[in-house]
Amino acid sequence: MKIGLVINPQSGVGGSVALKGSDGAELQELAKRRDGEPKGSKRAHAFLERLLLIIDDLTIELSWKTWGDEMGETVLRSQQVDFEVLGHPKSPTAGADTSEACSVISGAGVDILIFVG
């Protein structure tokens, strides 16, 4: 099974400091100044831990495709699974990075695309 993974590394950073969302560089910077904590990577890590336990019991072979750095690569590397990075985000990440990642990974023939935000 071919699985695509895209993580919004900035998700949750605004909500944790009483901002409504985290879209845009200005809101992300304000959230960081208020010690906002992004939640996307933590959510993805928790999801993958559970998924990999289930998959391991079923002996299903997985092929992962993801985007670079915090948009998938870092979390998959921490889980010690084989994966392919199909591109890299700009820094800081923006909505355009998510759109590009989803488009490229979907076009790579994955069976399912998992988005964590």
For every predicted segment, state its role.
Residues 116-117:
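Short, acidic/small-residue loops that bind anionic groups at enzyme active sites
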Residues 1-112:
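ATP/NTP phosphate-donor binding region
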